Amino acid sequence: MKKTWTIEKARKLYNIEQWGNDYFDINKNGNVIVNIPGEDGKSEMVYDVKEIVDQLIKQEEIHPPMLLRFSHILKHRLAEIHNVFANAIKTYNYTNRYQGVYPIKVNQERHVVDEILEFGKPYQFGLEAGSKPELILTLGAVTDDETPILCTGFKDDEYIETVLFARKMGRKIIPIVEKLSELNLIIKYSKKLKVKPVFGVRVKLASKGAGRWESSAGYKSKFGLTITEVLAVLKILEQENMKECLQLIHYHLG
């Protein structure tokens, strides 16, 4: 009986070109493979997923379902993001630099966070914590005073006090003010701990993006300060002689 199935049909059926982003493909044996690009863009390493699974079953007695992680893809993606911004900065003669941060709510597993920090170190990638547990995790994972830590989410007294303790210890930690009450806490604990804070504000933009999150943008956004509230922040900082402490603007289009 003539075989009608082909590798190209498999690629089309599983739509690999749309989601694989050149990291995934199908080899001549019909198995899914993982391509790890080198610095020249060509495949540096190729892994046959079926061979890996078969080896784990035979040698380690680990059976599906199983989760395979390819750290080299993470490393390549961080480099790719950095290079895209670096090229744009050079093209448009921008006088500053790009510095990304990884929101650990995406994946809080320790080895993932550690790899983000390791692979992102040449680019000074930082972390974003969106809750008290994430803040504690982040402070434990970051072992130097140069990696930026951005703090978002709901902030009570304990959260702000912890942030400013870390600041006093020399950490490069920046809380993002999303409500006026958070600014009052920053002022309160900076005086109590005798530390000069650095913080940002999250702004509600009047403009909207498009797509799934369009309805969450603009002044209807749940989080952030209106322009009127931002002006109030500036007035308070002027009264407290703390204008230089505001060094960051955070916003979402949706």
Tell me what each language-model feature is.
Residues 27-110:
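Low-complexity, highly charged intrinsically disordered N-terminal segments
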Residues 95-254:
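Active-site-proximal beta-alpha core segment in soluble small-molecule metabolic enzymes
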